[in-house]
């Protein structure tokens, strides 16, 4: 068990309340990977979740942060080892699963990708979900044989 800080959003009679609280890794959801978050990014969905707007987050209290990059501190998956640097974007992270605005996240292994060579956690989160989505689109177009002409 490790204690850590997290941005916390709670529903109230007047809307939502925000605070930074101390949590325990024991309180995180099930998953094969425990990741110490180095960086997260700011996405429009995070703002919607933090404001309590419907359609993004159904389960409160909650920690937003749909992107996270960091280092694995525990793994029960053979594809990942302690010390691996990873990126986690998408799926349910930061929506209904404790997100990157906490110092730790626990996620299913299939939500994570190993940090590509030449990229670090800070750079990965500067790019964020929007940048990764655009890069995946360009990659697929190139795989289909399109040439820049």
Residue ranges of each PLM-predicted region?
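Short polar catalytic/cofactor-binding loops
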Residues: 10-14, 40-42
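Cytochrome P450 core scaffold surrounding the K-helix E-X-X-R motif
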Residues: 45-51
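NAD(P)H dinucleotide-binding glycine-rich loop of Rossmann-like/cofactor-binding domains
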Residues: 89-149
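Short structural boundary motif marking the start of a folded domain
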Residues: 2-7, 33
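Glycine-rich beta-strand-centered segment in the early N-terminal region that forms part
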Residues: 26-42, 53-93, 116
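Short beta-strand or tight-loop elements
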Residues: 2, 19-21, 68
């Amino acid at each position: 068990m490790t204690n850590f800080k997290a941005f916390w959003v709670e529903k109230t009679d007047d809307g939502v309340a925000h605070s930074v609280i101390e949590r325990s890794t024991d309180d995180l959801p099930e998953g094969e990977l425990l990741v110490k978050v180095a960086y997260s990014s700011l996405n429009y969905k995070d703002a919607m979740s933090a404001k309590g707007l419907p359609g993004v987050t159904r389960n409160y209290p909650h920690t937003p942060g749909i992107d996270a990059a960091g280092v694995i501190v525990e793994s029960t998956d053979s594809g990942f080892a302690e010390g691996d640097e990873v990126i986690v974007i998408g799926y349910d992270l930061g929506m209904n699963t404790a997100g990157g605005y906490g110092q730790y996240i626990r996620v299913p292994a299939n939500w994570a990708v190993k940090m590509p060579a030449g990229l670090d956690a800070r750079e990965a989160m500067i790019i964020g979900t929007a940048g990764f989505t655009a890069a995946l689109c360009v990659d697929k177009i190139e795989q289909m044989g399109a040439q820049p002409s």
